[in-house]
Amino acid sequence: MFKIKKIQTVKFLSKNAAILFVFIFLMSCSKDPVVTPVSVYCSIISEKLLAFSRLSNFEKQRFQELSDTRLQKYKNDFIEAAETFDLEWELLAAVAFQESQWNPKARSATQVKGMMMLTLPTAASVGVTDRLDPIQSIYGGAQYLSELRQIVEYGTSSGDKTAFVLAAYNLGMTNVKNAVEQINGNPSKVTWLELEEHLIQLKSSMDTESYSRGQQTVDFVERVRDYYYLLLSQKCSD
């Protein structure tokens, strides 16, 4: 069991409420507690963290609409699966939204399908027999993220490591490993920003001139981060 560490966690308890604050996805920060009113943290999340988002207003609105409808049906499943594999449920749900917009029947031309858009080999490796079963898919995706977190040895901070895990989820661990080895003689010293720059430059015979597979992975990581922030920001309105 492992935990995908929060880049920064600040908890302010007021009766039964706990507000989770995370600074930015690619920075590791102090773990020291800070005693500040909840409203201040909510203001920071809303005005500062979301300022890094590349999502359009339409995309944010669409996310909120589906968060109020589709997500509510599966929220407890995300929470329980995340607890089982020591993940943040917001991160797990953010991956699912990027993959399928929380649509358990989603399919793609590349034969991945389901809530977490698992490939057939990946599904088999985590014991998923029906990829269109939302509960199986959520738990399978959580287990796969957990396994990747144990395998990934890259990144100089917890935020970096999370980005590498997400890249591996999207691109495949072997492809990430090969890319890292092309960057630096010491893979453990490679940062996410270095891998990001490298991936953007990668091209394959299947890539278009304007959009490479590597760029797709970079976009995947960034969008998961954005959705993760949006889910965290909802704590301020609970």
Q: Which residue stretches match the model-derived regions?
A:
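Bacterial N-terminal signal peptides that target proteins for export
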Residues: 4-17
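Bacterial N-terminal signal peptides
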Residues: 17-26
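N-terminal export signals and maturation junctions of secreted/periplasmic proteins
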Residues: 26-79, 105
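Catalytic and substrate-binding regions of cell-wall glycan-acting enzymes that process beta-1,4-linked
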Residues: 47-52, 163-230
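Second-shell loop/turn segments in exported
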Residues: 61-68, 78-81, 104-106, 124-135, ...
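Short, functionally critical alpha-helical segments immediately adjacent to catalytic or ligand/cofactor-binding
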Residues: 79, 87-103, 138-142, 165-171, ...
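Secretory-pathway/luminal and periplasmic proteins that interact with or process carbohydrate-rich
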Residues: 100-109, 148-154, 171-183
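Substrate-binding/active-site groove segments that recognize
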Residues: 105-129, 136-147, 196-199, 224
